[in-house]
């Protein structure tokens, strides 16, 4: 159905492509940013086609209206010796009123029908055998990612397998919120989906090529809305299997960092965070079992490095204003011990 609608829109979309290219940026350049014009997933391709169709129609309207405006300004500009007699008026002209009523109605009707067809094509999919089920929960200001069938809990990184002809593997996302309204959006994979307290929404993606894609919260949710980022990592089928196996393993119990482990369990850390295989089972903050396997800290606001981790433990709000994690007022020795322990959680 999506394919049929795209054929209807193809000629107008071509004009939209020309306008977009003229506006600046190559396809290669756009692919490096979270853009709906660089899709890598089946639903995102449909969204781009619809966007190009709408851009094409509105581009034609702009050219016609702007062209007429320029023509009128030039053709009827004031000249020396102009006849100042009032020209014939067209107020009440039935033909003109019909034209400026019927033409916009036809344009809106076409946009409505094509959009409805795309929406049905994108949202009409239901989970099927072989699909991956993931639950995404928005928090202020981070993302909790759960894989119910795999027993995996992580944060701020969505890992999914690529879908190919040999092994089609769509991913179906259950989107929820633990506090206020958020909106889950990875432009290159799918459209926005609101995360609303006490409500469950569904979204599906079907990535067609491996890679790393950037997303963000698209609904204002407080002081760190702009810092509520996430990353989608699309693996090959075999790489995803290895990633899942590593995430299912319990946390390492390294004897060299026993002081940091004891400190983690004795402070409020274990009341807010979970580390699988330990007494730490808090649910208010991200699961830290494999913290160091993630690329960023603070929901994408900084790279995950030993130095940044130590700075975060020392004073989270200095790095992410409004972060709900309090400063623990640790001594330098305690900071070193706690950092050393967390660095083993891979």
What are these regions (language model features)?
Residues 13-22, 62, 105-109, 113:
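Hydrophobic alpha-helical membrane-insertion segments
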């Amino acid at each position: 159905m999506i394919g049929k609608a795209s054929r209807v829109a193809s000629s107008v979309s071509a004009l939209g492509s020309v306008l977009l290219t003229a506006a600046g940026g190559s396809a290669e350049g756009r692919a490096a940013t979270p853009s709906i014009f660089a899709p890598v997933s089946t639903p995102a391709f449909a969204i781009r086609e619809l966007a190009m169709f709408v851009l094409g129609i509105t581009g034609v309207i702009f050219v016609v209206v702007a062209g007429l405006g320029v023509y009128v300004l030039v053709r009827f500009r004031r000249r020396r010796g102009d006849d100042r007699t009032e020209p014939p008026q067209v107020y009440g002209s039935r033909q003109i009123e019909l034209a400026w009523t019927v033409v916009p109605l036809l344009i809106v009707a076409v946009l409505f029908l094509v959009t409805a067809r795309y929406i049905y094509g994108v949202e009409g999919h239901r989970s099927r055998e072989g699909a991956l089920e993931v639950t995404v929960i928005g928090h202020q200001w981070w993302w909790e990612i759960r894989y119910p069938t795999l027993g995996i809990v992580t944060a701020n990184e969505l890992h999914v397998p690529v879908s190919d002809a040999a092994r089609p593997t769509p991913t179906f996302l259950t989107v929820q919120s633990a506090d206020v309204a958020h909106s889950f959006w990875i432009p290159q994979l799918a459209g926005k989906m609101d995360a609303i307290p006490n409500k469950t929404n569904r979204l599906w993606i079907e990535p067609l090529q491996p890679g790393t894609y950037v997303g963000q919260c698209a609904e204002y949710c407080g002081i760190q809305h702009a810092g509520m980022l996430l990353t989608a990592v699309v693996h090959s089928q075999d790489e995803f299997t290895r990633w899942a196996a590593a995430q299912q393993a319990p946390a390492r119990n390294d004897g060299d960092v026993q002081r940091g482990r004891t400190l983690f369990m004795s402070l409020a850390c274990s009341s807010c965070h979970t580390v699988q295989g330990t007494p730490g089972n808090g649910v208010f903050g991200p699961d830290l079992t494999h913290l160091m396997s993630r690329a960023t800290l603070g929901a994408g606001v900084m790279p995950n490095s030993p130095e940044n981790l130590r700075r975060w433990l020392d004073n989270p709000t200095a790095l992410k204003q409004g972060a709900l994690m309090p400063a623990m007022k640790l001594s330098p020795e305690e900071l070193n011990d706690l950092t050393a322990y967390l660095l083993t959680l891979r």
